[in-house]
């Protein structure tokens, strides 16, 4: 998760080491990782699979990559991505709701 990643990055920084973030094969999670990468002083690179079309689940659209291969952090609300709820529903195998009292 984000908290654990930040702890690892800060530990690496305390030893003068870089902490590079790898891809997740789900571009919505990669968008979260992109935000985390930008919050880490000792992160210089962001690994991302291309072509992206095979790794779009569960997000609508692709991450903004320019002609130099640089990804820009979206400035939309939240993490900047939109979930594809129709795709999620088509791939859901069950629904379970738990009522908490």
Go through each PLM region and give its residues.
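Shared catalytic-loop signature of beta/alpha-barrel
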Residues: 1-70
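C-terminal extensions of enzymes
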Residues: 53-101
């Amino acid at each position: 998760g984000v908290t654990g990643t930040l702890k690892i990055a800060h530990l690496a920084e305390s030893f003068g080491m870089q902490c590079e973030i790898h891809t997740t094969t789900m571009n919505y999670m990669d968008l979260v990782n992109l935000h985390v990468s930008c919050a880490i002083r000792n992160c210089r690179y962001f690994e991302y699979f291309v072509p992206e079309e095979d790794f779009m689940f569960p997000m609508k659209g692709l991450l903004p990559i320019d002609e130099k291969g640089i990804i820009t952090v979206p400035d939309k609300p939240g993490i900047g991505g939109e979930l594809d709820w129709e795709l999620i529903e088509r791939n859901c195998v069950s629904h379970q709701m738990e009522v908490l009292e």
